[in-house]
């Protein structure tokens, strides 16, 4: 076992417009090939579209969508005595955010539509209402954890 201490967690700086670390992390997830300004333009356009469509604060809709898509449980493969069990484990907040944001972005990519801004807008609106592909993925994950609840004592 390593005797070195764990490195300090690097918290990304908050974004300049909403002063939110979550927004900054989400923009970094949207970013492709290092084009951060494009990712920021996509995200802020999406938030403006949401605000125009719903007459609500776009950032609140975004936060609600993330909350609805964040899983509380997931399964992890654990090998015991020659057989592999799917062991349900709790999801830590950072991992939950990472899963939810990647599911929302993947669902938006697979959606039909003209531009990515439009696709992401529709996916965030669906996720904030509790439906959409990202929320379905969360429900599938919870269903899998519930089905394998018998193996919870193998937790590590």
PLM region spans:
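Strongly charged
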Residues: 2-33, 37, 44-156
């Amino acid at each position: 076992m390593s005797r070195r201490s764990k490195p300090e967690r690097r918290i990304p700086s908050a974004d300049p417009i909403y002063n939110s670390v979550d927004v900054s992390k989400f923009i970094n997830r949207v970013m492709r090939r290092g084009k951060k300004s494009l990712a920021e333009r996509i995200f802020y356009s999406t938030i403006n579209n949401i605000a125009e469509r719903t007459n609500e604060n776009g950032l609140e809709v975004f936060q609600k969508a993330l909350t609805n898509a964040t899983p509380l449980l997931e399964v992890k493969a654990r090998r015991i005595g020659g057989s592999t069990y799917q062991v349900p484990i709790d999801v830590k907040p950072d991992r939950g955010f990472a899963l939810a944001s990647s599911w929302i972005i993947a669902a938006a990519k697979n959606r039909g539509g003209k531009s990515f801004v439009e696709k992401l807008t529709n996916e965030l609106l669906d996720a904030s209402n509790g439906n959409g592909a990202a929320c379905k993925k969360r429900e599938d994950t919870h269903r899998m954890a519930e089905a394998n609840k018998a193996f919870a004592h193998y937790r590590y």
